[in-house]
Amino acid sequence: MLRLPTVLRQMRPVSRALAPHLTRAYAKDVKFGADARALMLQGVDLLADAVAVTMGPKGRTVIIEQSWGSPKVTKDGVTVAKAIDLKDKYKNIGAKLVQDVANNTNEEAGDGTTTATVLARSIAKEGFEKISKGANPVEIRRGVMLAVDAVIAELKKQSKPVTTPEEIAQVATISANGDKDIGNIISDAMKKVGRKGVITVKDGKTLNDELEIIEGMKFDRGYISPYFINTSKGQKCEFQDAYVLLSEKKISSVQSIVPALEIANAHRKPLVIIAEDVDGEALSTLVLNRLKVGLQVVAVKAPGFGDNRKNQLKDMAIATGGAVFGEEGLNLNLEDVQAHDLGKVGEVIVTKDDAMLLKGKGEKAQIEKRIQEITEQLEITTSEYEKEKLNERLAKLSDGVAVLKVGGTSDVEVNEKKDRVTDALNATRAAVEEGIVLGGGCALLRCIPALDSLKPSNEDQKIGIEIIKRALKIPAMTIAKNAGVEGSLIVEKILQSSSEIGYDAMLGDFVNMVEKGIIDPTKVVRTALLDAAGVASLLTTAEAVVTEIPKEEKDPGMGAMGGMGGGMGGGMF
C-alpha cells in the first residue's frame, strides 16, 4: 500500500482548514438587465454629481484627498472625474465609462469635460428609463447618433472664426472661470509667439503671474570655462554677429580648431564652438588666447545625450545655416572647414547654466522642412518623454516659447490656478482651430430647432432624438442651478429670446452673449457632445455586466495570535 510521507499526512488537515478562506482568482459575478443598469446608473450619478458642481462661473470647488501631500482643491472637471473610484464593482463600471468620456474630451479638446459628463449622464439616464419601458436600445442609439450629427452640423453653421486678440482673451477668461488676468496673459502670449507657437505652463516663484518669452534657440548648457566671460554684467559671454562651429565629437586637439579660428578672424567675427566636449590642449589654447590677445571665442557642451544630442545639433545647423562635423554619412573633417560650413547668428548669450542663439541665418525653406519632419514624428510617437523632447525642439525652431509662470501664496493655490490656466490655454487653442459659438450652454440650446426636421425610421429612433433634445438643455440648466436659480425657467426664457441672448450666471441677468464675450470654442462643445453621446448610448445597449469577485485574503494564524495577545496581557499584570 502506498504510504504518504509524514510531512504530507500532517499537511492535509491544515489544507482543509484553509480551504474555506480561498477563492479562485478568476471567479466572476454576472448581473443582467435592469438590475445591472440600475447599479451602473448609480455610479454614473455619483460621478456626474461630483463633477457638475464645478460647472459655470459660480460653480464650486472640489477637495480631493491625495495619497501624499496636502489635499488638492480644484474646479477642473476631468481632475475630479479621475479621482473617483467606487467600492461597488457595478457602480464603478458606470463611473469609469463616464470617466472615459471626460478623458477623451480632455485629450481631444483640452476642455469641456464637465459639459461632456453632464450630457453623458442625461443621455444614459433617459436611455435606461425608456429601455425599462420596452424600447429597443439599438434603435435608440441610432436615433441618438442621428440627432448628434444634426447638432454638429448646426454648430458648424453657428461657428465664427476667432480674429482678434480681444476674442482670444474672452475665450481664455471664460475657461479660466472669469479670471481676466489669465485671459489677458494668454492673449499676450499668443500675440508674441503666434497662434501655433509653443506656450508652456510652469510654477512661478512670485505672488503674481508672469509671462516670459524665450526667442531663438535656448539650451541648458553654459560655457565650459568661466574665462570665456567677456562682460562684467551678469557673468556671461555676449557676441553680436557670430560664427558657429558644430561638432558631434569631442575636440581635444588644437590643430582641429585652428582653421575655424582663422576663418572667423579673417572675417572679424566671434566664434562659438558647440561640441560633445572641448578639453585638453584645445581648451587650454582657447582660454590662453582669450586672456592674452582677447580672442573672441566661447566653447559650450552640446545639449542632450545620444540621438537627442545629434538631433539638437542638426536643428542648430539648420537654424544657423551651418553643418555638423562628425555627423554620420558626411565626410566633414574639422581641419577642412570652409566659411559656408559655419553657422551664422545675429546674437549669442552664454551664461554658466545656459546658452541662447538668437536671429539664426538659416534658410527659411530648410527650417520649415525640419519643422514639418518633427511635427510628423510627433503624430507617430506614443512615448510621453519623446513627445516632450519633440515639442521642445519644435519650439526652438519656430517663433520661440512663451512660458506662463503661475504665481500664488501657497502650493494649493498655485496648483488650482495652474489647472485653470491649462484649461484656458487648451480652450484658446481649440477656438483658434475651429472658431467660437455662444457660451453658457446657449449654443446647444440654439441647436434644438434643427432636430425638428429629422425623419427617424421608427418610433424608437424618435425616442433617441427626443433624448438628445432634452440633453441639450442640461449644460445651461446646470450652470443656472450652480448660480442658485431655477434652471428650467432660465432655459425656457433663453429659448424664447433672440438668437444671441443668453444667461450671464455671474451677473444673474439675460445679456447679449457675444457683446459680453461669453463664448465657447466650437471644438470643445462639439467634442463634448460627440464623446458623451457615443459612450452613454453604448451604455444603454448593455444587457449583461461581468465583474470580478474580489479574493478573500484571511490569515489563518490570526486567531492563534489573538489568543497569544490575551495570554501575554494576563502575564503582564
Swiss-Prot record:
Cross-link Glycyl lysine isopeptide (Lys-Gly) (interchain with G-Cter in SUMO2), sequence positions: K551
Annotated positions of the N6-malonyllysine modification: K133
Alphabetical keyword list: Acetylation, ATP-binding, Chaperone, Isomerase, Isopeptide bond, Mitochondrion, Nucleotide-binding, Phosphoprotein, Transit peptide, Ubl conjugation
N6-succinyllysine PTM positions: 31, 82, 125, 133, 191, 202, 205, 218, 236, 250, 301, 352, 396, 455, 481
Compartments, record wording: Mitochondrion matrix
Pfam families: Cpn60_TCP1
Transit peptide: 1-26
Residues recorded with modification Phosphoserine: S67, S70, S410, S488
Keyword Cytoplasm: no
Chain positions with N6-acetyllysine modification: 75, 82, 87, 91, 125, 130, 133, 156, 191, 202, 205, 218, 236, 249-250, 269, 292, 314, 352, 359, 389, 396, 455, 469, 481
Class of this enzyme: isomerase
Gene Ontology molecular function, alphabetical: ATP binding; ATP-dependent protein folding chaperone; isomerase activity; lipopolysaccharide binding
Residues carrying Phosphotyrosine: Y90
EC number per UniProt: 5.6.1.7
Reaction(s) the record says it catalyses: ATP + H2O + a folded polypeptide = ADP + phosphate + an unfolded polypeptide
Claim: Phosphoprotein is one of the keywords in the record: yes
Binding site for ATP: K75, D111, G112, T113, T114, T115, G440, D520
GO BP, one annotated term: protein refolding
Quaternary organization: Homoheptamer arranged in a ring structure. The functional units of these chaperonins consist of heptameric rings of the large subunit Hsp60, which function as a back-to-back double ring. Interacts with 2 heptameric Hsp10 rings to form the symmetrical football complex. Interacts with HRAS. Interacts with ATAD3A. Interacts with ETFBKMT and EEF1AKMT3. Interacts with MFHAS1.
Record-stated family: Belongs to the chaperonin (HSP60) family.
Role this protein plays: Chaperonin implicated in mitochondrial protein import and macromolecular assembly. Together with Hsp10, facilitates the correct folding of imported proteins. May also prevent misfolding and promote the refolding and proper assembly of unfolded polypeptides generated under stress conditions in the mitochondrial matrix. The functional units of these chaperonins consist of heptameric rings of the large subunit Hsp60, which function as a back-to-back double ring.
NCBIfam families linked: GroEL, PRK00013.1, PRK12849.1, PRK12850.1, PRK12851.1
Stated name of the protein: 60 kDa heat shock protein, mitochondrial
Organism for this UniProt entry: Cricetulus griseus (Chinese hamster)
